Amino acid sequence: MARMVHCIKLNKEAEGLDFPPLPGDLGKKIWQNVSKEAWAGWLKHQTMLINENRLNMADPRARQYLIKQTEKYFFGDGADQAAGYVPPPAA
C-alpha cells in the first residue's frame, strides 16, 4: 500500500515519496510533507531554472541556489521564475 501524506504544496492527501529525495533535514522534511505529484512539479521547475539560468551543476554555488529554491518552492513563498521564460500556449 502506498504511503499517504498531506501534501504541503497541493494541500491534499496524496501518495508520498518512496524515499527522501535529498540528504539531510531538508530531504526528510520533503519526504514527510510532499507528494509524488508535487515533487514531479518541482523537478520540471528545477529543470527550467537550470536551463534558463544556464546553471552549471558542477558549481557548488549553483547547487546551493537550487537547494534554497527547493526550500522556497515547498516551504516558503515560492521559487524564482526564470527570467524571460514564456510558457507555451495552451493547446
From Swiss-Prot:
Keywords: Iron. One of its GO terms (molecular function) is iron ion binding. GO terms for cellular component: cytosol. One of its GO terms (biological process) is cellular response to oxidative stress. It holds the Pfam family Iron_traffic. It comes from the Bacteria. Gene3D superfamilies: Fe(II) trafficking protein YggX (1.10.3880.10). Could be a mediator in iron transactions between iron acquisition and iron-requiring processes, such as synthesis and/or repair of Fe-S clusters in biosynthetic enzymes. Belongs to the Fe(2+)-trafficking protein family. This is Probable Fe(2+)-trafficking protein.
